[in-house]
Amino acid sequence: MDSATTFSWAEADFCISATVDGAQQRLVELATIVYDRVCRTNFLAPGFCLVNLGAELSSQAFRRFMLALERQMKHLHRERLDRDLILMSAARFDQQVTTKPHRDGGPDECFLMLGYEPSPIRADLLMSDYSRCAHDMGLTPGEYLEKHNPMFAAGLRILKDYTTRVTCFCNLSFQILLINNSIAEFSEVAPRWQGVLHTATIVNPEESFRRVVNSLMVASVPIGTEEPISSKEQDEFVHTNLVRRSGYDKPSLEDDA
């Protein structure tokens, strides 16, 4: 923890540099570090981390590495908790919309893997530890969001002292941002993942450029649960050129094929 701001994490707590070199041992080591920082059941870890892979990489190799990292985290999860990890969604989109602190829906225990490709579009990212804030206020994470919605100014103010800026984020590199997206209640008897909210402020949006995000949602489930994203769909995620651009906020945009 950063002593200057009580609940803000230092860069060394969440910033990691790595390479995609095919070495299994390095992948195992990276997965262990990432798992420990993201898949927390208390407040001794950030609940998020950023892995910078540099700029000398292809998009397909990047996406393939994301899936390899997720599979290695799956092995860890089985060994430690006798539970499984499954992919709930896999998508690629052009994200150039500023957001407020939010979670992306999904099961009570899940995390996001957001794979950012190099782009001229700059962004500032913030992580807000709403689970810890809720715990300090005697609330569950769900109750906290109902009573102090951070989409509004009053709720946003409460989170100020629980917010960390992702200072190592670089728009010129391939990066994987892993975010504990959970909303589970804290328990020492039956530990469950404790989530954080994320915020993106787009500095210089420009529709003629792209800010490609490769997004995976990963859930913690009992072993034997069927995975919604098939092997074929995972392969398509790696090899597709499709980038979703249209949405509720920009319905007129056409997707890149």
Listing of model-derived features with the role each one plays in the protein:
Residues 128-135, 140-142, 151:
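C-terminal folded domains that constitute the principal catalytic or ligand-binding module
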Residues 1-79, 237-257:
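N-terminal auxiliary "cap/dimerization" subdomain that precedes the catalytic jelly-roll/cupin core
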Residues 75-128, 148-150, 156-165, 199-202, ...:
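Conserved double-stranded beta-helix
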Residues 126-134, 232-238:
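Short intrinsically disordered coil segments
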Residues 40-43, 100-107, 166-171, 206-210:
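A general structural signal for short secondary-structure junctions and capping/turn motifs
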Residues 55-58, 118-121, 182-185:
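Short, solvent-exposed loop/turn segments at secondary-structure junctions
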Residues 154-257:
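Catalytic core of Fe(II)/2-oxoglutarate
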Residues 49-52, 112-114, 124-125, 176-179:
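A structural signal for short, well-ordered beta-strand segments and their strand-loop junctions
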